[in-house]
Amino acid sequence: MTVMAPVVTVDGPSGAGKGTLCKALAEALQWNLLDSGAIYRVLALAALHHHVDISSEDALVPLASHLDVRFVAEDGQLKVILEGEDVSHEIRTEAVGNTASQAAAFPRVREALLRRQRAFREAPGLIADGRDMGTVVFPDAPVKIFLDASAEERAQRRMLQLQGKGFNVNFERLLSEIKERDDRDRSRPVAPLVPAADALVLDSTEMTIDEVIARALAYAREILA
């Protein structure tokens, strides 16, 4: 019988701190890392690089099935490697984002990327960052964490992040956008944003990131021991 590599899934809403937590867990455990939120952007960039017709589901499916992508946690930063090239910044452009939205509309593309995400499950283990990792992608994962925080706290974090990059942002507008996205994510008919029944729910509203990492790491090590 084949023994599957263990998986730690980290799900939760935008701005809860999933990315930071997953990078820390991957570095601490020396495990593989999957950033599911970046997968569609990576596919979009690959399509642009290879001049694949983004409006053609038939053209996108083979590209999605064989997407050559790796995620590397290094010194607290996430590197996205597409076909051996660091595209961490390139996938964040508006053009790539728009293309990613188009690609995500195709059911067979989503199915191909679901299989591709599951292929990240390799020894010694995988840290999977997303919204439906514990409920849809890896329902048999031994360690599931749902990281949450109040909408106000997440808006505050996002505002400070954007201000640090030199952007002038409005808190109320950010808060409204986050609440709208939460409503969409939690009420969608397919893979809604909900904690898995067996997930540890961590509310990071009143916690520092170091406290979140320590709690999650202790929980993972306890389950995996």
Curated annotation (Swiss-Prot):
Family statement drawn from the similarity comment of this UniProt entry: Belongs to the cytidylate kinase family. Type 1 subfamily.
Pfam families hit by this protein: Cytidylate_kin
Protein name stated in the entry: Cytidylate kinase
Any one GO molecular-function label of the UniProt entry: CMP kinase activity
Residues binding ATP, per UniProt: 12-20
Biological processes annotated in GO: nucleobase-containing small molecule interconversion; pyrimidine nucleotide metabolic process
Reaction equation(s) it catalyzes: CMP + ATP = CDP + ADP; dCMP + ATP = dCDP + ADP
Compartments in which it is found: Cytoplasm
Domain of life: Bacteria
Gene3D superfamilies found in the cross-reference section: P-loop containing nucleotide triphosphate hydrolases
GO CC aspect terms: cytosol
Enzyme nomenclature, EC number: 2.7.4.25
Keyword vocabulary terms for this entry: ATP-binding, Cytoplasm, Kinase, Nucleotide-binding, Transferase
